[in-house]
Amino acid sequence: MNADKPYFAIGFPNMAGGYEVRNRYFKGCVAPKEISHIRQQGEPRNMCYLFEGFMDYLPFLTIRIKNNPQYPRLTTQDYIILNSVSNLAKVESLLTNYTQIGSFLDNDTAGRNAYETLKAKFGERLLDKSLYYRDYKDLNDYLCGKPLSQSAEPIKQEKQVQSARRMMQPPKKRGLKM
């Protein structure tokens, strides 16, 4: 809390005990930074869906449930969330266990480069699911109805890891400087 004002954010756990943390003003993590791997119970799955961030994974779940509320098929595959394209090398060994990999990466330079890197390694096993939202930066923009031409500039991170204390501080107001 800062000046007796509470702040909140949604946190998404990763494999190293850290959290990806988001709110309207903040995008960061509570260290350590790592991927998130969601494995289904029971028999190992042949399919894995790969997302750049959890703000792409959550819209995927929403779209699946909205399109088919009776049978959204959420447990027929595992999920890997990179939490940053810089974590791409960390998922390659995990992805070798799957016969099919659905790639829901962003339609920007970083997302396309990551896709091409994976395509070189996994070939036809990698399926480009970003074609479903090709006129949008990512699945979240698709769900919100914000085409690429209307999409806000992505948040630029100078640091991958920010402290939880810094997360609790609201952003500084910035006005027009002349």
Q: Residues of each region from the PLM?
A:
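TOPRIM fold recognition
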Residues: 64-178
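Phosphate-handling DNA/RNA-contact segment within nucleic-acid enzymes
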Residues: 2-94
